[in-house]
């Protein structure tokens, strides 16, 4: 099985689950549950590792209780950490997540850490597949180092990454696979719809692009061939937080096992469907047997 390196910052998710609505200014609303879990960039490597994939992560955890709690969960999950952790005075990013039956919203603090970019090449050289985010590819020589060492580069994006279209598009030729949601695809491509965006973006990466569409599944392109995949209902919906991160984990799980592109898409769709049955973007009950049984 191929080794995966994830490059991302982590945050601590404070999840107010089962909210009947979102409070306005001066209002207070009670949810049915409350959970604290690692979030952000931690979701993909945790799920990958729980599925049995060898995973390491270049990240930075703060010198506080939340940073130490995230570190314990990552290590418990089997994720190897690259970089200096808990440096004196650093603070962990935090997101308060208010989750309703249909969607969620966030109030976040960005933290004061920073990744140890001086060890970037060493970390990349020891992996087979590198997973990171478009913003990092714009700022650091990740694509160049992956090319130098012959590593596959799979990149996720968020809306903030794609708003600067010129800079984001300039990064695409160094990327093997780009994963975006429908809104991000339209924004980045400048096209009117997801289908046109798929063709536009797919022609600018090395291998292809995946466009996720929530409950409508998604569309993808690999070496010029179009694919469509459905959303998969894996149980009672609880929380949409981390569905995209887990699609990425499922896709990478498939690729690391040598599955075909459409098989890897199916793995991603099924793990995303499973993720929305949890509160938060990861769950320690996940294992390979559980996912394979659901296949």
What are these regions (language model features)?
Residues 1-60, 65-69, 76, 237:
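Glycine-rich phosphate/adenosyl-contacting loop at the front of the ribokinase-like
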Residues 1-11, 72-86, 98-227:
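Ribokinase/PfkB-type carbohydrate-kinase core domain
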Residues 4-5, 194-295:
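Conserved phosphate-binding/catalytic region of the ribokinase-like
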Residues 15, 107, 188, 275, ...:
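Residues that scaffold the ATP/ADP-binding catalytic core of kinase and kinase-like folds
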Residues 32-39, 65, 87, 91, ...:
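Residues at secondary-structure transition points
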Residues 48, 181, 244:
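Short, conserved phosphate/pyrophosphate- and ester-handling motifs at nucleotide-, phospho-/glycolipid
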Residues 51, 90-92, 214:
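Short, basic and Ser/Thr-rich N-terminal targeting/leader segments
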């Amino acid at each position: 099985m191929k080794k995966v390196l994830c490059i991302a910052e982590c945050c601590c998710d404070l999840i107010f689950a089962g909210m009947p609505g979102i409070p306005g200014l001066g209002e207070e609303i009670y949810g049915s549950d409350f959970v604290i879990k690692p979030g952000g960039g931690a979701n993909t490597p945790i799920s990958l590792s729980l599925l049995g994939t060898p995973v390491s992560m270049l990240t930075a955890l703060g010198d506080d209780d939340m940073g130490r709690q995230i570190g314990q969960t990552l290590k418990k999950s089997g994720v190897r950490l690259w970089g200096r952790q808990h440096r004196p005075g650093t603070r962990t990013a935090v997101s308060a997540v208010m989750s309703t039956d249909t969607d969620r919203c966030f109030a976040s603090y960005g933290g004061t850490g920073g990744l140890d970019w001086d060890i970037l090449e060493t970390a990349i050289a020891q992996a087979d597949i590198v997973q990171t985010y478009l913003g990092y590819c714009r700022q650091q020589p990740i694509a160049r180092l992956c090319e130098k060492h012959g590593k596959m580069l799979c990149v996720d994006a968020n809306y903030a990454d794609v708003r600067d279209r010129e800079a984001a598009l300039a990064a695409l030729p160094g990327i093997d696979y780009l994963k975006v949601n429908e809104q991000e695809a339209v924004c980045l491509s400048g096209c009117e719809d997801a289908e046109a965006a798929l063709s536009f973006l797919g022609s600018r990466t090395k291998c292809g692009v995946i466009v996720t569409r929530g409950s409508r599944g998604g569309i993808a392109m690999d070496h010029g061939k179009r694919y469509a995949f459905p959303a998969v209902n894996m149980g009672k919906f609880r929380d949409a937080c981390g569905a995209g991160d887990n699609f990425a984990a499922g896709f990478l799980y498939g690729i690391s096992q040598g599955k075909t592109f459409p098989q890897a898409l199916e793995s991603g769709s099924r793990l995303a469907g499973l993720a929305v049955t949890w509160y938060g973007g990861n769950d320690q009950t996940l294992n390979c047997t559980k996912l394979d049984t659901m296949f």
